């Protein structure tokens, strides 16, 4: 079992109804945690928290409703297995969505958002995503790290056609819960070129509704060849890195989907960034 399968969280967005009426489920999504024990952030897509399209800002619900809170299904340990621990997180202070509790980029087209949740509920399995990018040194067993020269401290490249994975719950189907579905997603556009002048790129993957907000991972298994600088490197260690946040397909008839880079995520949550990280976009 890969422990990262527990790292993608099943989310439901809800509208709070006034006057004693039942609350309305707006839809399923996926999220994940970044941060440190006792100080976590819940990450998903902007449109999951806002209930609006990221391209034009229009409300997505046919009833004209937007989320007031989300329910997150965490995995708790019980009798050698897992039990669901459902936690509600309000998205706003008060009843009328005035003061939002979550962060997002100034440009809503960068479809990511993060909500500070702090410590997890008691008994929950803590499975957060890594916040560092691997280097060649990480391909060697830990006992051999020190003997490697400084040349191996170069970051592993991310290139078009490289294989990535989107971890989530397609169509909101939690039949595999608490383990997420790993959807293979080759890189379909040049990662460094951006997407519409924004910090993202395209994946070629049959992702579906319910996977919005999912973590996108690079996962290299032991023995898989890694090409760096024209050299083919065979290795004994598995390497995993958080590449970004998946936010959905560019069109309902297309299998091309958008992923926003981890740097764009750290721009809104610098508290969870690795030591020495610096923003890539100018700040005032």
Residue ranges: model-predicted function:
Residues 1-4, 48, 218-284:
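C-terminal subregion of chymotrypsin/trypsin-like serine protease catalytic domains
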Residues 2-19, 69-71:
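A short, Trp-centered hydrophobic/proline-enriched beta-strand micro-motif
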Residues 18-24, 37-38, 80, 195-197, ...:
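Short, solvent-exposed loop/turn segments that connect beta-strands within catalytic domains
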Residues 44:
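Cytochrome P450 catalytic-core helices
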């Amino acid at each position: 079992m890969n422990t990262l399968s527990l790292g993608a969280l099943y989310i439901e967005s809800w509208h709070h109804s006034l006057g004693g009426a039942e609350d309305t489920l707006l839809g399923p999504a996926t999220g994940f945690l970044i941060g440190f024990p006792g100080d976590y952030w819940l990450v998903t897509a902007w449109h999951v928290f806002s209930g609006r399209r990221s391209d034009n800002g229009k409300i997505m619900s046919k009833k004209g409703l937007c989320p007031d809170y989300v329910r997150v299904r965490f995995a708790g340990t019980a009798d050698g297995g897992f039990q669901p621990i459902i936690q509600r997180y309000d998205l706003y202070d008060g009843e009328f969505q005035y003061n939002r509790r979550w962060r997002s980029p100034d440009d809503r087209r960068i479809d990511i958002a993060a909500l500070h949740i702090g410590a997890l509920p008691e008994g929950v399995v803590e499975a957060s995503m890594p916040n560092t990018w691997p280097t060649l040194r990480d391909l060697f067993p830990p006992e051999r790290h020190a003997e490697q020269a400084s040349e191996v401290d170069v970051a592993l490249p991310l290139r078009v056609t490289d294989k990535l994975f989107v971890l989530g719950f397609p169509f909101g189907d939690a039949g595999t819960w608490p383990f997420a579905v790993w959807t293979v997603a080759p890189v379909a556009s040049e990662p460094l070129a951006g997407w519409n002048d924004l910090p993202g790129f395209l994946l070629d993957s049959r992702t579906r509704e319910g996977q919005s907000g999912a973590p996108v991972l690079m996962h290299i298994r032991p023995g898989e060849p890694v090409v760096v600088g024209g050299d083919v490197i065979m290795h004994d260690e598995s390497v995993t890195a958080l590449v970004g946040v998946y936010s959905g397909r560019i069109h309902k008839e297309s299998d091309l989907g958008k992923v926003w880079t981890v740097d764009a995520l750290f721009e809104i949550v610098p508290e969870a960034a690795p030591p020495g990280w610096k923003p890539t976009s100018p700040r005032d």
